[in-house]
Amino acid sequence: GQGLTDEGVHILDGFVGTGTFITRLLQLGLIEPKDLARKYAHELHANEILLLAYYIAAVNIETTYQDLRGELGDPGDYEPFPGLILTDTFQSWEDDDRPDLDVFVQNNERLEKLKALDIRVIVGNPPYSVGQDSANDDNANEPYPALDAAIRETYAARSNATLLRNLYDSYVR
């Protein structure tokens, strides 16, 4: 089998928030020191839709990486985290998703590369919105037709449960 540190094992936090899961992954030593630079530059991926959280995640992940490099005796120059993308993870894979080709060019390039990868590991804490369906709710469910169709045709079609609504909650999706 393969582990988190192995080459080619791409890790995604699709709802990175302020970067806690990625920073803890780096800090826990689950990635071997010899693999750290490769993993950081090419195999760690994090998506966030809220701009403030996106910037906080960038600072947290980049600072953690820099600190780890210093502990390993190779502080080197500061390196921005290339795996961070400003996006709605679910909407990004919808058929009607329209990338911003004018303003967020580099961000869109990162997203297209991510979508072509074989993601092996998903970490993180997705948004919680069960039972919410109004824009007035704290965290209303958004419709994702392609994702919902895939759930309907696979998990829901094979389920014996009578209440399938929770399958479409963002926490479960």
Segments predicted by a language model, with ranges:
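SAM-dependent methyltransferase catalytic region
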Residues: 1-173
